[in-house]
Amino acid sequence: MASFFDDDQPSNLTEFSVSELSGSIKRTIETAFDQVRVRGEISGFRGQHSSGHAYFSLKDDKARIDAVIWKGSFSKLKYRPEEGMEVIATGRITTFPGSSKYQIVIEQMEPAGAGALMALIEERKRRFTAEGLFDPATKQLLPFMPKVIGVVTSPTGAVIRDILHRISDRFPVHVLVWPVKVQGEGSGDEVANAINGFNAFQPDGVIPRPDVLIVARGGGSLEDLWSFNDEAVVRAAAASAIPLISAVGHETDWTLIDYAADVRAPTPTGAAEMAVPVKADLEAQLAGLAARLAGAVNRQMDHRRQNLRALARALPSLDQLLALPRRRFDEAASGLGRSLELNTMTKRQSFERAAAKLSPDMLVRRLVERRQRVSERAALSDRIIERLIERQKANLGRIDATLTAVPARLKAQTGRSRDRLDSFSRRADSAVINDLRRARSTVSAHDRMLQSLSYKNVLMRGYAVIRGQDDRPLSRAAGLEDGRAIAIEFADGRVSAVTGEGDKASPPPQAASATTTPAPGRPNPLPKSPKKSEPPAGQGSLF
């Protein structure tokens, strides 16, 4: 039994324990792969861990390796890792002796070329579109005349100077600048925080809340503009309650914030022009409306004045009105002298008779009665005069109120006229745009129909067109003389040719085939060889 367990064949291999072997493998691998660059696709990325580290895998079509980015290295990355993103990672290989596993500790990471960045942009665009962040129905209209404009850009670049200069030229308003980095590490977070910060302002706060926002940056490469493709920036722009204008790069540069913004400007200067109108144009429009209003008022006054004159002409003249009263007055004046004499005589007689009957007591009573009657009439006259004065004051008050309300009504009418004019202008612009679109669609359809019906499509399949000297197509051989110049048109050009002699007396191939068709089952007879023609007399043979 002892010989069964004894090793009769000694070995020269070194004996390791498991921990010794694992440690040796760890030292060998970490020494050999102390600094490596690996290209692969990110898989299993779920964002940063609560500790700040990031854990995921790099894979290709044949293998997979675990990867980790420590918190300090993650904050320095220019491009944040995303699921499915193809990257080139730089780092070192480490192993875990306790579980026989290895991983790469990534220190630097960048996309694997512009193609990877474009693929990532397209993937984000599809995802954001599915979420409704780019829905045109959520776009806000820009205010016609903003009082405060917020600008998110670099405070030291030429962009902010161009924006301020353009706004000052067109319509000077209050501008708030939120300084941010527009490229590099952390720039995307700064832009998103700036948009959210402007939206957090209160309308009646110490710092006024902007009526419109401009997010601007100058031109650059895809890597320079990458901050404006950041998910945080896109979501902040889409969620902004303040209308937002994106002006990133040149007209040919498109970033994801352009799709999320309410309006996209081709340049920062164009964004300033969209934000404010031209003050001189507004003043000219107001002057024109004021002139039209003054003209309308003058025309109305002239019309009323003409009506008044027409009514005045319809009234009789003053002489006609006073003719009859004057006649009556003259007649009365002529008989007044006699009437006065008779009346005086009658009154004197009556007075004498009454004086004979009067006594001192009666005279006193009559005098008291007359004085009392005069006092009552004087009081009544005072009350009547006071009522007349109050009535005239009320009439004057109503007239004053009417005259005071005339400017307000004219101002309201001016506002309504201005609103109607703006509405008509917008409807006219919309109608012109729709007509242009329909015309462009009609022209495109006609062009496609012409292309499909062109005979050159037939030439491309191997056919040809024979044209005469007048460049008209020839469709029959009849009437075509020998020696006539013709042109043969192929798909790639034309060649010239001359018609030669042909057997015009021979029947067409169809007729000949119809008359010589053999019976079924019999072989086709061989054609007879033509007889040799004899040369004319007196002419030698060449053979």
Swiss-Prot record:
Task: Give the top-level enzyme category.
Answer: hydrolase
Q: Which GO terms describe its molecular function?
A: exodeoxyribonuclease VII activity; nucleic acid binding
Which parts of the chain span the membrane according to its record? Answer: none
Principal localisation: cytoplasm
Its GO biological process annotations read: DNA catabolic process
- What keywords would UniProt list here? Cytoplasm, Exonuclease, Hydrolase, Nuclease
Spell out the residue ranges making up region: Disordered. 498-543
The record's GO CC annotations read: cytoplasm; exodeoxyribonuclease VII complex
What Enzyme Commission number(s) apply to this enzyme? Answer: 3.1.11.6
Where is the protein situated, by its record's location annotation?
Answer: Cytoplasm
The domain of life is: Bacteria
Catalytic reaction annotation: Exonucleolytic cleavage in either 5'- to 3'- or 3'- to 5'-direction to yield nucleoside 5'-phosphates
Query: What is any Pfam family matched here?
Result: tRNA_anti_2
User: What does the record note on quaternary structure?
Assistant: Heterooligomer composed of large and small subunits.
Stated family: Belongs to the XseA family.
| Purpose | Bidirectionally degrades single-stranded DNA into large acid-insoluble oligonucleotides, which are then degraded further into small acid-soluble oligonucleotides.
Write the protein's name: Exodeoxyribonuclease 7 large subunit
